C-alpha cells in the first residue's frame, strides 16, 4: 500500500500534460467558448482572428473554422432533428442550409507569433448542443462543439 501512493502521484503528474489542448477555459461556459472559437459574423483575417483564441490556451491552435453567422442562427440549428456525433453521442444537429465560413490553418510560427492561411468555404455544418448553463443565452439548447463541416 505504501508503494501505491508514490505511483499514484507519479501518474497524476504525468497525466497533466496530456489533458486535451482543445479543452475550454473553465471561466467560460462551453457555449461562450464555442462562440469565441467559431462565431464570426463578419470575416476577419485569420492571424488576427486566431490570436484571441490562442491567447486563452497559450499555444498556436493548428486549425479552426469560423462560421460567418450569428450565435442566434447557429443556436437555432440545435432545434433541428438530432443526429449521432463523431463521439457517438446523440446531441448533434446539422444545419439546414450551407453558410459562409473560413477555415484557418497554422502555417508557421510559435506562440504568440502564430501564422495562418485562410480558405473561404460555403458548406453545411454539424454542431453538438447541450442545455444552457446559467450565464448562457436562454435557448432550449446551445451549441457547444463544432463537430464537422460537410
Curated annotation (Swiss-Prot):
Residues of the site described as Critical for catalytic activity: 61
Sample GO molecular function, one term: nucleic acid binding
Highest taxon above the source species: Eukaryota
PROSITE patterns given in the database record: RNASE_PANCREATIC
Glycosylation sites: 100
Site (Facilitates cleavage of polynucleotide substrates): 59
Function text: Ribonuclease which shows a preference for the pyrimidines uridine and cytosine. Has potent antibacterial activity against a range of Gram-positive and Gram-negative bacteria, including P.aeruginosa, A.baumanii, M.luteus, S.aureus, E.faecalis, E.faecium, S.saprophyticus and E.coli. Causes loss of bacterial membrane integrity, and also promotes agglutination of Gram-negative bacteria. Probably contributes to urinary tract sterility. Bactericidal activity is independent of RNase activity.
Protein name: Ribonuclease K6
Source species: Pan troglodytes (Chimpanzee)
Gene name as annotated: RNASE6
Amino acid at each position: 500500500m505504501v508503494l501505491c501512493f508514490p505511483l499514484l502521484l507519479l501518474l497524476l503528474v504525468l497525466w497533466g500534460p496530456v489533458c486535451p489542448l482543445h479543452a475550454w477555459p473553465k471561466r467560460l461556459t462551453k457555449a461562450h467558448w464555442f462562440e469565441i472559437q467559431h462565431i464570426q459574423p463578419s470575416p476577419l483575417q485569420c492571424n488576427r482572428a486566431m490570436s484571441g483564441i490562442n491567447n486563452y490556451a497559450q499555444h498556436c491552435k493548428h486549425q479552426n473554422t469560423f462560421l460567418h453567422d450569428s450565435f442566434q442562427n447557429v443556436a437555432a440549428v440545435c432545434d433541428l432533428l438530432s443526429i449521432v456525433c463523431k463521439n457517438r453521442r446523440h446531441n448533434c444537429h446539422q444545419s439546414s442550409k450551407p453558410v459562409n465560413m473560413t477555415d484557418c490553418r497554422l502555417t508557421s510560427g510559435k506562440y504568440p507569433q502564430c501564422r495562418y492561411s485562410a480558405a473561404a468555404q460555403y458548406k453545411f455544418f454539424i454542431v453538438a448542443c447541450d442545455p444552457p448553463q446559467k450565464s448562457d443565452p436562454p435557448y432550449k439548447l446551445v451549441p457547444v462543439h463544432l463537430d464537422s463541416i460537410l
